[in-house]
């Protein structure tokens, strides 16, 4: 039984990863007035099951924001958006790519989000540039009605200046920690794929994530969720320890200065309430 919001309860901000890996990515951000999805990976049935596990009603979703057009971020998009009549937003380049591959079919509203952002039921969503091998990738910050700020920052080969400035002061950040460098370099992936992942248009490593996490915590972020972990080239414990050790070495105290979590690839039941 879905009971995400108890009668009379004011939920200021909620966040959960519905899925987070190289196989599928989708995050929920919401409050008592409804919620949004950032990306729609898996398939529509699996996505709805993931929402059910975390107590989110698909009918409460007011919009879907797409970071880029890669399959692990959009595989449920067309069916889910059509079934629940949910509007979809993406950068101009990403939206054009979605149209080209037939993901936008005219059964739901699809529109461009520009640098000015958009208000969705009191949630102010704004994109920031990332660096990925796609048409026009981005991450998103979400300013909630009661003052909290959350962000999804994955699929980038490095921390862009715009990403850095956009995330200052976020209360919670889903931050990419895609791969362990040694596991990737010695793993089974072909050379060209390893080079793609390691490039400036690839993915953040555990070490990259750890370095940026220090900056975020020093600038006010209290909760960091490590996301988009590779099943083949990473391990949740290793990802967690890499960033946690870096924060500790910088003189920051876990559970006092920050809280750190590694998002599971799927079957997440953790709903963060701010």
Q: Where are these predicted regions, by residue range?
A:
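Active-site metal-binding motif and surrounding structural segment of the metallo-beta-lactamase
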Residues: 45-90
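Cap/insert and terminal regions of metallo-dependent hydrolase folds
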Residues: 161-262
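Metallo-beta-lactamase
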Residues: 92-140, 144-147
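Active-site neighborhood of phospho(di)ester-bond hydrolases with catalytic His/Asp-centered motifs
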Residues: 38-41, 62-69, 89-92, 151-154, ...
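Metal-dependent catalytic neighborhoods of phosphoester/phosphodiester hydrolases
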Residues: 75-84, 100-101, 234-241
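Active-site environment of divalent metal-dependent phosphoester hydrolases
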Residues: 71-74, 95-97, 134-135, 159-161, ...
């Amino acid at each position: 039984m879905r009971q995400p919001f108890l009668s009379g309860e004011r939920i200021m901000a909620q966040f959960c990863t519905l899925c987070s890996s190289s196989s599928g990515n989708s995050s929920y951000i919401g409050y008592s007035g409804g919620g949004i999805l950032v990306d729609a990976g898996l398939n529509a049935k699996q996505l709805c099951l993931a929402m059910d596990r975390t107590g989110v009603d698909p009918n409460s979703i007011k919009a879907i924001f797409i970071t880029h057009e890669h399959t692990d971020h959009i595989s449920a998009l067309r069916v889910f958006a059509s079934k629940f009549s949910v509007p979809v937003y993406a950068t101009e380049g990403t939206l054009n790519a979605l149209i080209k591959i037939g993901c936008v079919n005219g059964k739901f509203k699809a529109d461009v989000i520009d640098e000015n952002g958009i208000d969705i039921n009191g949630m102010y969503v704004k994109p920031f540039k990332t660096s990925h091998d796609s048409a026009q990738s981005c991450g998103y910050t979400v300013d909630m009605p009661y003052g909290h700020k959350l962000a999804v920052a994955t699929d980038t080969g490095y921390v862009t200046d715009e990403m850095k400035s956009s995330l200052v002061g976020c209360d919670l950040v889903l931050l990419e920690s895609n791969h362990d460098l040694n596991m990737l370099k010695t793993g089974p992936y072909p050379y060209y794929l390893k080079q793609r992942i390691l490039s400036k248009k690839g993915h953040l490593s555990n070490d990259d994530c750890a370095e940026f996490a220090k900056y975020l915590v020093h600038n006010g972020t209290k909760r960091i969720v490590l996301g988009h972990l590779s099943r083949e080239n990473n391990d949740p414990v290793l990802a967690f320890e890499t960033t946690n050790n870096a924060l500790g070495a910088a003189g920051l105290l876990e559970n006092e200065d920050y809280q750190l979590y590694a998002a599971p690839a799927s079957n997440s039941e953790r709903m963060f309430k701010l």
